[in-house]
């Protein structure tokens, strides 16, 4: 019997494998979603370092948002990560949704990042 944790890990590996094949040297926009907050970071897998990051726990975000776990918060994080990526000179990324379904908060973050100028 396969546990739900193993299914999630397998799905994340499958998505990561597809991203690695399509990356062509582009950094990846990785999303982590918890029950309370949402986090995004742009990672350069070639050098193994984080180029930009944003989350709902940052001081400016915490004060302006009612909750860190809704679509508005995800949209704000998407806008912020796109802004920080632009400052770092990053225009193209590969979107890494991990094991999460492209729906709800993950989709809101992706659309905000696209609206902010990132292309993927």
From Swiss-Prot:
Arranged from A to Z, the UniProt key words for this protein are: Ribonucleoprotein, Ribosomal protein, RNA-binding, rRNA-binding
Q: Which GO terms describe its molecular function?
A: 5S rRNA binding; structural constituent of ribosome
Recorded hits in Pfam families, A to Z, give: Ribosomal_L18p
Q: Which GO terms describe its biological process?
A: translation
Cellular component, GO annotation: cytosolic large ribosomal subunit
List all membrane-crossing ranges.
Answer: none
| Family assignment from sequence similarity | Belongs to the universal ribosomal protein uL18 family.
Question: Function, please?
Answer: This is one of the proteins that bind and probably mediate the attachment of the 5S RNA into the large ribosomal subunit, where it forms part of the central protuberance.
Q: Which NCBIfam families match?
A: L18_bact
The subunit structure is: Part of the 50S ribosomal subunit; part of the 5S rRNA/L5/L18/L25 subcomplex. Contacts the 5S and 23S rRNAs.
- Protein name as annotated: Large ribosomal subunit protein uL18
């Amino acid at each position: 019997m396969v546990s739900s944790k193993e299914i999630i890990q397998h799905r994340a590996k499958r998505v990561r494998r597809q991203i690695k094949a399509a990356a062509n040297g582009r950094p990846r926009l990785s999303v982590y979603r918890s029950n309370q907050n949402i986090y995004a970071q742009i990672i350069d897998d070639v050098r193994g370092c984080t180029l930009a990051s944003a989350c709902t726990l940052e001081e400016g975000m915490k004060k302006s948002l009612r909750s860190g776990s809704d679509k508005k918060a995800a949209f704000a994080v998407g806008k912020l990560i796109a802004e920080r990526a632009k400052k770092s000179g990053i225009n193209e990324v590969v979107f890494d949704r991990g094991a999460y379904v492209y729906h709800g908060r993950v989709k809101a973050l992706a659309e905000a990042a696209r609206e902010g100028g990132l292309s993927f």
